[in-house]
């Protein structure tokens, strides 16, 4: 743990490994073999690790690498539902249902040939068009693909526009107990949350539903606005470095996130306000369970000091993250 604050994180205080790094594992594209398009308990783990171990994962982009040119047709190239390929699952020794998987994101690094970033318009997909879930008579928007040079200096949208390079993990989570949930969908297990806070320096906390936890990861972005409005971020192949620990007997309903300055709870649902309600309800419960607030006081404080972050407004369920600064967590 290089950042000083990590020594005081929940992961360091309560994790089996106490924040100490263990063995380092490499999960290359070759070692991964077949990708997964659902989160579930039925796939054999590609890797089994111990609490505290570090895993370096090579991920494919959300398109499976098939869109290589601005002349490509997404409709012709993409094969639904085989989108958003996931690496894993990674099993963690000693993890049982009712535990928590703590995942610290060390790095998300762009890999592959330039232009490494891809975004596009996919007909009948996005936040301002008719979709299968929101049926409209309007004709689909025309397809369009944009390829971008991506490096630490920025995302070169055009000769005049350079976006900040803010890499993060779009899709990450654990296995449900018996369900198989599409990698395109976010839910209580995590999944396709598209939340820009899931970035280097953050620690995610997932409720475990099955033995081993079974962590999946993929779909990294180089940049994305709140809501991922058109349905597609600046998609990229990436090398992701994760340190994974276990907190025994810490059970809760939805994913949580910790940074140096704030705590966040994540909810996914339709309509959008229900995702916000889930996120805020879970934050009230966390403040009550671990920080000495009664629920009414927490509810009232969040009305003044809470913040809400829109992850996506395009997926089968929408994602919101509710947060509060740590400096206010004194009851």
Could you describe each region identified by the protein language model?
Residues 12-78:
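N-terminal, Lys/Arg-enriched amphipathic/low-complexity engagement segments
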Residues 30-40, 80-87, 181-189, 283:
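Short, structured beta-strand/loop micro-motifs enriched in basic residues and often containing a Trp
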Residues 49, 92-95, 198:
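Short, well-ordered loop/turn sites that connect or cap secondary structure elements
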Residues 107-200:
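Intrinsically disordered, low-complexity linker/loop segments enriched in Gly/Pro
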Residues 165-273:
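Conserved mixed alpha/beta catalytic, RNA-binding, or beta-rich assembly cores of soluble enzyme
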Residues 57, 100-103, 206:
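A generic structural signal for residues embedded in beta-strands
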Residues 62-73, 108-121, 212-222, 311-313:
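Short, Lys/Arg- and Gly-enriched loop/turn segments at beta-strand edges
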